[in-house]
């Protein structure tokens, strides 16, 4: 079986990064089992890869299911283990004290039993053996040289489901049907045959379920469980459409349109082989083709007769689970041999030789001519279930020490032919670890063999399927998205899921929450009217009590097939199909009561927290339950309602008459066979029971002359979620309050769209009406109808979506608008495109930006259908610059026959679907047809195939080139380059030959003198300097002039429009070294100094030294002299221009100062004179009184002696001039 490869392409925006160093964002990561290996664009691994399970120190039973790269710094991975077991606490007492506990818990004891392979032996639940094997989100941080270091893990815990006491009826404590009741009823309805969580598969003509032979002791247990819940016993249909897995093993003959099984109790009604034909021919054919029917001969687990046993199916089931087949498709080479070197206990003979010292195990495998037909006609049910993510204990194997068995897988076998075991089916080339042994080629073809322990214990013990709640938990951890520290985990597109997780990257664990209701949008008024009239969706005077009851349930379906989720900017975008469908009447009689009517809608009330399961079982819900005692619930998720004389008109009061199945003599009276289908994976059986019915997930029947076709359309639920709503969902999930136990957060910006399935998935419809709906056509010839589906759901009319990828659409910018967000989803027959408004966090209005919020392009695949199988999607890449989405598919994983039961000639190779933002192009055989009904485009680029080599991986390099990794007959890896020519990828032999020359490096080395992948660089002679008068140029001048640099070399491209440039490096003042940078197929330029993740590429590009440049430019001296003179002139001018005016001002100032001084002197003299007069007058005044007094004195006095004369006083000097 081919290794499962998952590819991630990361674009490099060179303008944002230094040319010398290429970021790790330009590498690819290939997933090989649990190992993530970073690849360069040259298909070369950077290192040995990261084994995420071992790095996180988890049990080897864990497998990697999804991962996301967060820039260059973080890696987020999702892992899960098939050893997980979940138990449901069924409260039987009225004691309310326990109702606050979670009804769901991990069952470590059952996990230990599963690990030991024992159902009854003791289990050690202490210490390391008490693991619950829950799913985890692993976070790794980046380390140098493209490596990753484990940082932490986040446990995905179970949702909180409030326990309810017995006697609370169908209504929970909040007045609504609770999830507790839903899960309780799921467990009751599940169970009785191995692989079958639903007893409805094993039934007898017209006999009630409780009397069907389930095996020793199981009948009474069944009755007891149902009686406790007050459920009535329901009759089975009138024909056997089921099988018991301990007899028929549910094989489908791939070149026929019905499965081959052994009918129960010799009943011969129903499609397929009866007991006589089975025993006489088909049984032997199945045993020879598919060993799991019952091994015969040496090493066999027992003949088919030993599988009859009782209901416990001890030895037969054990042998089925223990087989280890080697699958090789039919070959024209009769002498091709593959054999195992030594005998093994069961199945093909094998032994693993384990070298000493922990070296890798080597296994030789050969094949005999008698084994060439193995698995060429039949497919095993358990293997198909395992492929879609269902836990099948016997197929869950992992590597480890002291392995007791092997599982061998061919690289060119289809994935549907071998057990899809964790340690086997996804194994690729050995990496040196004990978990991935090396290969030893012993014949024309080599196979990959993985050593690993099979279950311990006695072969008489039974490995039963885990309960349905365990399966729901396991399959709900299938894909993840990372948004700014919040991680969203959801289910798959193959099994309906009930819940999802939103956890923070800093949490240690996070609980799940479940889907809230969404409003139904039926598309057209007519379609809505159909549903209202037939199902009682509208409450009016004509509605009867049954319809009112159905209305009360709200037609809600919280079970989804997750088509995909992705992150764009700071928003999460998701899309899913509701697990149900609407059937239409195919009658051409316009007077018939069922003409143009939608006759059934599956509410999947068993999963409906608002409706409840009991109402369906007791036939109180009208259409979706037992009808007139002739129809019974077939499985947990979906129902089939074949109708004859269905309720008509708007009264809805006619008697329901059901004929089941429609037989040849009843064709004229039957009006419809309505397909109500919850899981689309039914390609391995299309009549009666499918392989997925074994899990209770699906029911489907063939469109042939004995059954009128129906039309089934679905509701596509989609939305955009911001960070705030994600946070609310995460916080709400942790709540244990009663209100939050039944109603979870509803994302406000979600919507549903009624998405029809294109009619051309059934061939031979009349072409009149130009693609009119099939049910609206006249003259339909029922006998010529044939499934034309190209995917793995070949015999289902149900829709299916995969590969959702979101991105920024810059197209509105050209019209003056902001860019919006776009997401593309591939569905059967076309492309769905969703457009979101980033400003409002909502879908675009129909008038916004000239874009519709949702568009669907009906684009048939035509004869190129062999290139497209939606179930084999490997990767999707969106390139905003070109507006293209690239979907890569692995054709090697397709079944041997397609939906038309015609053998496909070439199954080895890859296909790429290109979806563009505008227009519709369908490229087929180099012919292009342009359609215009929707703004999404579909182009099948076929041709990536190999007739001799095994293709193991594809790396889309651009919209023009893809690199394909292949292994030849000697198991030597090589790379081929495919070129897109008019929509078809064709191998380019010359380029493929060129990329081989890598000399053990990361990239192909450059080869002097030849035109290889890097083209050829011819340097000019040094004389070019004189010829072009460059000797007067300096090195810096040349480096900064691309035109001059380009004249130094001549480039011969290896492919059209390949570009090259020279980069100059100054080595001295007169010498220059030039090196080329050359464009590779991915559109990026690489040079000698380029690195990826810090690792030099060492391409060995040539270089050339040119000498003789001028040390100084010729203009340096004149400029220097001129600049000096100029400076002097400037200084002189400045001096003169400033000094002269300053002198004049000085002179004027001096003259002004003189005048001022004169005036001051005059004023000073005047003031001095006045001051002198004042002093004189003051002296005279002082002497006057004393003289007057002396004159008045009459008495004579003695004569006075005259005084001596005094010296004269100096004159008073005027003030000195300042």
Curated annotation (Swiss-Prot):
Sequence ranges of Polar residues compositional bias: 217-231, 411-428
Compositional bias (Basic and acidic residues): 265-286
Signal peptide: 1-25
Major site of localization recorded for this protein: membrane
Keyword Secreted among record annotations: no
Listed Pro residues bias regions: 1205-1218
Compartment(s) of residence: Cell membrane
Keywords: Cell adhesion, Cell membrane, Membrane, Signal, Transmembrane, Transmembrane helix
Single Gene Ontology BP annotation: cell adhesion
Segments crossing the lipid bilayer: 1121-1141
Comp. bias (Low complexity): 116-129, 301-342, 1192-1204
Classification lineage: Bacteria, Bacillati, Mycoplasmatota, Mycoplasmoidales, Mycoplasmoidaceae
Gene Ontology annotations for the cellular component aspect, listed alphabetically: plasma membrane
This protein's name: Mgp-operon protein 3
Region: Disordered, residue numbers: 109-129, 213-245, 262-353, 411-440, 1192-1218
UniProt topology in membrane: Single-pass membrane protein
Annotated organism of origin: Mycoplasma pneumoniae (strain ATCC 29342 / M129 / Subtype 1)
């Amino acid at each position: 079986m081919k290794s499962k490869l998952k590819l991630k392409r990361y674009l490099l925006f060179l303008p944002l990064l230094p040319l010398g160093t290429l970021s790790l964002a330009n590498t690819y990561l290939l997933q090989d089992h649990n190992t993530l290996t970073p690849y360069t664009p040259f298909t070369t691994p950077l290192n040995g890869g990261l084994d995420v399970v071992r790095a996180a120190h988890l049990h080897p039973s864990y497998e990697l299911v999804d991962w996301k790269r967060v820039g260059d710094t973080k890696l987020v991975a999702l892992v899960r283990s098939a050893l997980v077991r979940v138990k449901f606490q069924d409260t039987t007492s009225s004691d309310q004290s326990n109702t606050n506990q979670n009804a769901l818990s991990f069952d470590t004891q059952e996990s230990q039993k599963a690990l030991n392979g024992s159902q009854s032996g003791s289990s050690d639940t202490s210490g390391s053996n008490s693991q619950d094997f829950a799913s985890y989100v692993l976070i790794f941080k980046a380390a140098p040289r493209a490596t990753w270091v484990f940082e932490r893990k986040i446990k995905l815990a179970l949702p909180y489901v409030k326990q309810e006491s017995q006697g609370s009826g169908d209504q929970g404590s909040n007045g609504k049907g609770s999830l507790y009741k839903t899960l309780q009823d799921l467990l009751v309805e599940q169970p009785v045959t191995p692989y079958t969580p639903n007893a409805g598969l094993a039934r007898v003509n017209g006999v009630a379920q409780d009397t069907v032979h389930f095996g020793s002791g199981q009948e009474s247990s069944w009755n007891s469980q149902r009686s406790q819940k007050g459920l009535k016993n329901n009759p089975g249909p009138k024909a056997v459409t089921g099988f018991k897995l301990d007899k028929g093993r549910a094989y489908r003959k791939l070149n026929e349109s019905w499965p081959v099984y052994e009918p129960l109790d010799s009943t011969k009604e129903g499609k397929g082989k009866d007991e006589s034909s089975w025993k006489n021919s088909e049984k032997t054919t199945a045993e020879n083709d598919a060993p799991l029917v019952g091994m015969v001969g040496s090493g066999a687990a027992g003949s088919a007769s030993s599988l009859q046993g009782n209901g416990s199916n001890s030895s037969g089931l054990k042998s089925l689970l223990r087989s280890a087949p080697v699958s090789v498709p039919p070959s024209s080479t009769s002498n091709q041999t593959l054999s195992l070197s030594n005998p093994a206990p069961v199945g093909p003979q094998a032994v693993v030789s384990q070298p000493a010292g922990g070296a890798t195990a080597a296994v030789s495998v050969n094949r005999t001519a008698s084994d060439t037909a193995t698995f060429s006609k039949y497919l095993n049910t358990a293997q198909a279930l395992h492929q879609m993510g269902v836990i099948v204990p016997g197929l869950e194997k992992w590597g480890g020490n002291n392995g007791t068995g092997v599982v061998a897988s061919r690289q060119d076998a289809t994935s549907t032919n071998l057990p899809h075991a964790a340690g086997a089916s996804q194994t690729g080339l050995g990496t040196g670890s004990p978990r991935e042994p090396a290969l030893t080629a012993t014949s024309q073809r080599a196979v990959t063999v993985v050593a690993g322990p099979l279950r311990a214990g006695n072969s008489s013990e039974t490995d039963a399927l885990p309960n349905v709640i365990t399966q729901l938990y396991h399959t709900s951890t299938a894909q993840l998205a990372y948004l700014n520290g919040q991680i969203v985990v959801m289910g798959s597109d193959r099994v309906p899921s009930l819940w999802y997780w939103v956890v923070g990257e800093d949490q240690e664990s996070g609980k799940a929450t479940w889907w809230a209701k969404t409003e139904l949008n039926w598309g057209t008024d007519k379609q809505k009217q159909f549903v209202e009239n037939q199902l009682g969706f509208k409450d009016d005077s004509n509605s009867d009590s049954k319809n009112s009851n159905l209305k009360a349930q709200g037609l809600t379906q919280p079970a989804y097939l997750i088509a995909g989720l992705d992150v764009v900017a700071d928003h999460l975008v998701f899309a899913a199909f509701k697990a149900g469908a609407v059937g239409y009447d195919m009658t051409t009689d316009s007077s018939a009561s069922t003409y143009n009517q939608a006759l059934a809608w599956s509410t999947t009330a068993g999963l409906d927290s608002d409706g409840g399961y009991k109402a369906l079982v007791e036939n109180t819900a009208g259409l979706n339950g037992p009808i007139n005692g002739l129809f019974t619930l077939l499985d947990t998720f979906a129902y089939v309602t074949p109708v004859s004389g269905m309720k008509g008109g708007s009264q809805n009061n006619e008697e329901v008459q059901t004929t089941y199945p429609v037989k040849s003599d009843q064709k004229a009276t039957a009006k419809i066979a309505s397909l109500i289908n919850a899981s689309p994976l039914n390609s391995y059986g299309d009549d009666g029971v499918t392989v997925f019915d074994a899990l209770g997930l699906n029911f489907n029947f063939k469109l042939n002359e004995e059954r009128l076709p129906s039309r089934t359309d679905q509701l596509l639920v989609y939305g955009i979620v911001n960070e705030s709503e994600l946070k609310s969902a995460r916080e709400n999930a942790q709540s244990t309050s009663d209100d939050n136990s039944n109603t979870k957060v509803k994302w406000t910006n979600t919507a549903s769209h009624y998405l029809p399935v294109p009619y051309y998935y059934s061939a031979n419809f009349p072409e009149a009406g130009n693609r009119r709906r099939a049910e609206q056509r006249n003259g339909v010839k029922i006998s010529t109808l044939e499934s034309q589906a190209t995917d793995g759901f070949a015999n289902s009319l149900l829709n299916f979506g995969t590969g959702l990828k979101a991105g920024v659409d810059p197209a509105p910018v050209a019209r003056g608008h902001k860019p919006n967000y776009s997401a593309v989803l591939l569905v059967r027959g076309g492309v769905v495109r969703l457009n979101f408004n980033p400003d409002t966090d909502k879908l675009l209005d129909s008038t916004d930006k000239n874009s519709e919020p949702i568009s669907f392009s009906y684009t048939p695949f035509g004869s190129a259908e062999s290139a497209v199988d939606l179930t084999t999607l490997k990767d999707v890449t969106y390139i905003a610059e070109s507006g293209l989405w690239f979907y890569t598919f692995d054709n090697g994983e397709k079944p041997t026959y397609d939906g038309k039961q015609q053998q496909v000639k070439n199954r080895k190779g890859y296909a790429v679907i290109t979806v563009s933002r505008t227009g519709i192009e369908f490229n087929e055989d180099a012919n292009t047809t342009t359609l215009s009904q929707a703004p999404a485009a579909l182009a099948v680029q076929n041709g990536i195939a190999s007739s001799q080599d095994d293709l193991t991986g594809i790396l889309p390099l651009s919209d023009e080139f893809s690199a394909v990794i292949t292994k030849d007959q000697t198991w030597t890896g090589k790379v081929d380059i495919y070129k897109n020519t008019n929509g078809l990828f064709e191998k380019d032999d010359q380029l493929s030959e060129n990329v081989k020359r890598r000399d053990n490096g990361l990239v192909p080395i450059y080869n002097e003198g030849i035109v290889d992948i890097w083209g050829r660089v011819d340097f000019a002679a040094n004389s070019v300097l004189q010829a072009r008068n460059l000797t007067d140029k300096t090195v810096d001048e040349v480096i900064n002039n691309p035109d001059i640099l380009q004249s130094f070399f001549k480039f011969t491209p290896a492919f059209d429009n390949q570009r090259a440039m020279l980069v100059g490096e100054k080595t001295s003042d007169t010498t220059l070294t030039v090196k080329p940078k050359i464009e590779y197929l991915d559109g990026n330029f690489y040079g000698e100094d380029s690195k990826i993740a810090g690792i030099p590429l060492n391409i060995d590009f040539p270089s050339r030294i040119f000498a003789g440049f001028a040390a100084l430019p010729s203009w340096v001296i004149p400029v220097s002299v001129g600049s000096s003179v100029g400076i002097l002139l400037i200084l002189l001018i400045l001096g003169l221009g400033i000094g002269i005016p300053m002198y004049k001002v000085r002179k004027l100032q001096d003259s002004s100062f003189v005048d001022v001084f004169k005036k001051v002197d005059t004023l000073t003299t005047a003031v001095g004179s006045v001051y002198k007069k004042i002093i004189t007058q003051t002296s005279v005044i002082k002497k006057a009184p004393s003289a007057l007094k002396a004159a008045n004195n009459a008495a004579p006095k003695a004569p006075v002696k005259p005084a001596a004369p005094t010296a004269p006083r100096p004159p008073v000097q005027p003030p000195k001039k300042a």
